[in-house]
């Protein structure tokens, strides 16, 4: 079976730290400040993102520069999926949710963003000292991580793939129900999508979108160490 491009797998980082960050939404300068404050070393460390690179913030155009950095590895978020589907999505709804920056790009620039975003994986799996850690934007549609990987590696398509993506990109059901059942066969699943005032976990699912994209209202970027599952709080 050929591995699906919707999954990206990473071996353990033997040189430095593996960190995960919540939704970015075009606030790359503040993200860089957060990384600097915890002495992030791009020669040794890796940064994984739960997606939503753009919309809402002032620096959305910088996303392509960040995607070119060999140590930066995001999954696709629901806002990133707007870019992937820019020719067919509900443009009015997108603009209401921060997508106006994309409408101001030239057609060639839009095509470049769309091509790069379509290459983003839906899921990332990182091997750590304690075992595998998964990353999705919102939630896992199966009780086991392997269940998701098997479906994606099998090349599921059409309505079935759309249903899987809908949960991975949009679902808030678990956190709304305070469901602590977790995901089997993972040390942890790290997600964003739902803003929280501090990092929280339900079972082994870690919610780390602490609102780095609304600093005016007290939000900040949390950086989660994937080996220890310890949140690092950059200086604010």
Predicted regions and their residues:
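N-terminal active-site segment of His-dependent metallophosphoesterases
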Residues: 1-63
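Conserved beta-sheet core of the metallophosphoesterase superfamily
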Residues: 171-234
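Active-site neighborhood of divalent metal-dependent phosphoester bond hydrolases
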Residues: 60-134, 141, 155-171
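Beta-strand-turn-beta hairpins that frame and shape the catalytic cleft
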Residues: 12-19, 125-134, 202
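Divalent metal-coordination and catalytic microenvironments
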Residues: 23, 52, 67, 77-78, ...
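Active-site environment of divalent metal-dependent phosphoester hydrolases
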Residues: 25-29, 55-58, 80-84, 141-143, ...
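Residue-level marker for buried hydrophobic side chains located in beta-strands
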Residues: 20, 47-49, 74-75, 134, ...
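Active-site-proximal beta-strand elements of phosphoester/diester hydrolases
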Residues: 18-25, 133-139, 207-208
């Amino acid at each position: 079976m050929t591995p699906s491009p919707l999954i990206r797998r990473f071996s353990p980082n033997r040189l430095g730290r593996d960190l995960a960050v919540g939704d970015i939404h075009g606030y790359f300068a503040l993200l860089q400040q957060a990384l600097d404050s915890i002495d992030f070393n791009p020669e040794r460390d890796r940064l994984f993102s739960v997606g939503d690179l753009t919309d809402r913030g002032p620096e959305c155009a910088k996303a392509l520069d960040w995607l070119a950095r060999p140590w930066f590895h995001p999954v696709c978020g629901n806002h990133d999926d707007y870019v992937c589907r820019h020719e067919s999505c509900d443009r009015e709804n997108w603009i209401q949710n921060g997508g106006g920056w994309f409408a101001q790009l030239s057609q060639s620039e839009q095509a470049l963003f769309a091509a790069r975003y379509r290459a983003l994986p839906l899921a990332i799996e990182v091997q750590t000292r304690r075992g595998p850690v998964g990353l999705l934007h919102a939630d896992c549609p199966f009780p086991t991580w392997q269940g998701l990987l098997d479906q994606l590696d099998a090349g599921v398509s059409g309505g079935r793939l759309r249903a899987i993506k809908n949960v991975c990109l949009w679902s808030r059901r678990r956190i709304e129900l305070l469901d602590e059942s977790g995901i089997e066969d993972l040390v942890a699943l790290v997600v964003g999508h739902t803003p929280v005032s501090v990092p929280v976990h339900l079972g082994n699912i870690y919610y780390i979108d602490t609102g780095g994209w609304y600093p005016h209202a007290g939000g900040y970027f949390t950086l989660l160490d994937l080996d220890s599952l310890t949140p690092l709080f950059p200086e604010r």
